[in-house]
């Protein structure tokens, strides 16, 4: 949801298939092409993000490409801050990541995390991306709420 994309449309609830009960945003063409990425609210009210690793997510060595993990982390910033955003427009101001372990084709890649602080315009988030083998990446980032950009006709 980087780049001032519209969170205002709200996430779509998926009703069928592997991702039934999960949500996704349809308003970010890059993430739709890169993922698709999903999130849901857990029983304890926390947010969990996930996607299924495919061949197109791998690098030449057969491991998940670091750029894919960073893109998923960027998605997770917005999913983890979903409630604080309240359908506002926002952009990623910073995103830091530490790569810890690999993922392979077919893995379920998940993320959990938390909002560290939410102010009027800035939201600070941290999380961990993992698969069944353990942690893959830790990350932290900052989201800034912005006004939607006017469309020029």
Predicted stretch roles:
Residues 1-153:
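Terminal targeting signals and extreme-terminal segments of soluble enzymes
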């Amino acid at each position: 949801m980087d780049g001032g994309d519209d969170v205002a449309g709200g996430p779509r609830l998926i009703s069928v298939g592997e991702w039934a009960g999960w949500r996704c945003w349809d308003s970010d063409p890059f993430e739709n092409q890169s993922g698709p990425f999903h999130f849901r609210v857990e029983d304890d009210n926390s947010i969990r993000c996930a996607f299924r690793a495919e061949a197109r997510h791998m690098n030449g060595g057969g491991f998940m490409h670091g750029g894919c993990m960073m893109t998923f982390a960027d998605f997770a910033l917005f999913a983890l801050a979903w409630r604080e955003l309240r359908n506002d427009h926002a952009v990623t101001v910073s995103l830091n990541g530490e790569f810890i372990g690999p993922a392979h084709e077919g893995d379920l890649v998940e993320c959990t995390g938390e909002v560290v602080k939410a102010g009027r315009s800035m939201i600070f988030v941290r999380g961990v991306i993992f698969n069944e083998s353990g942690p893959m990446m830790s990350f932290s980032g900052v989201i800034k709420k912005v006004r939607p950009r006017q469309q020029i006709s």
